């Protein structure tokens, strides 16, 4: 389950 707008970053 990823937030809408997830791409290649993490912990932003």
UniProtKB/Swiss-Prot annotation:
Molecular function as annotated in GO: toxin activity
GO cellular component terms, semicolon-separated: extracellular region
Location(s) in or outside the cell: Secreted
Top-level taxon of origin: Eukaryota
Tissue expression profile of the protein: Expressed by the venom gland.
Coarse class of the protein's main subcellular location: secreted
Assigned keywords, A-Z: Hemostasis impairing toxin, Secreted, Toxin
Role description: Inhibits coagulant activity in human plasma, possibly by interfering with one step of hemostasis (modulation of platelet aggregation, or coagulation cascade, for example). Does not show fibrinogen-clotting activity and does not inhibit ADP-induced platelet aggregation. Also does not show hemorrhagic activity in mice.
Family: Belongs to the snaclec family.
Protein name (Swiss-Prot/TrEMBL): Snaclec uracolectin
Species name: Crotalus vegrandis (Uracoan rattlesnake)
Lineage summary: Eukaryota, Metazoa, Chordata, Craniata, Vertebrata
């Amino acid at each position: 389950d990823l937030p809408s707008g997830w791409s290649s970053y993490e912990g932003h």
